[in-house]
Amino acid sequence: MVMNHIQISEHELKTEVFTPEVVNYLLEMTRKFRERRDQLLQERQTRQTLFNTGSRPDFLPETSEIRDSSWIVAEPPADLNDRRVEITGPVDRKMMINALNSGAKVFMADFEDSTSPTWNNIVRGQINVRDAVYQNLSLTQDGKDYNLKEKTATLMVRPRGWHLPENHIIIDGSPAPASLIDFGLTVFHTAEAALARESGCYFYLPKLESHLE
């Protein structure tokens, strides 16, 4: 059984976030990518040892084409064409509503530095991101109602860094990579709705240390 290979800490919203389909998805994704992720983290240490002994970083011959002045990239999605005003903040429900209503072009919901990675914050943060994409993110607090405007900032999500574990999800005996959990839950719960709105799941990947990562 899947649950023999994955243990997820209890939470009052656990069954809403971690459906059987989600659990299978997270298990398969972690098994596919965790070994490579661990190798890349080890390569960080190897590079640091080289730098500590006097080696200096340089450009790789195999990536020379991207430094050619003729090199171009594809156009960004339409709703990311204008990022002149972009704000970021935690995945708290009230703060997300205010940020999405702020008039900024892009709001980056940050599971990393802006959010204390308690289990409650992570689980509720995923609910909040899902509700934002489905445009039903709302809150009543201290007698005041908070709702999304008709036009909101484009939503981007910043998952936690490669190096961070999610100790509340144990897969095959080890904590799951937090980055894969944040990414996987967001894609599973929001991709279909985002595409239906002619948008997409947009991610800011923090603290990468090489092009391989």
PLM-predicted stretches and their roles:
Residues I72:
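Conserved mixed alpha/beta core segments that line enzyme active sites in large multi-domain catalysts
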Residues V91-K94, S114:
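Short acidic loop-to-helix transition motifs that present clustered carboxylates
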Residues M3-E28, K32, P57-S69, P77, ...:
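Conserved alpha/beta-domain cores
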Residues F51, M108-R124, L205-L208:
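Glycine-rich, proline-tolerant flexible connector loops at the mouths of alpha/beta enzymes
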Residues G125-S138:
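Acidic, Ser/Thr-rich peripheral helices and adjacent loops at domain boundaries
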Residues R34-D68:
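An N-cap/entry alpha-helix motif that binds or orients negatively charged groups
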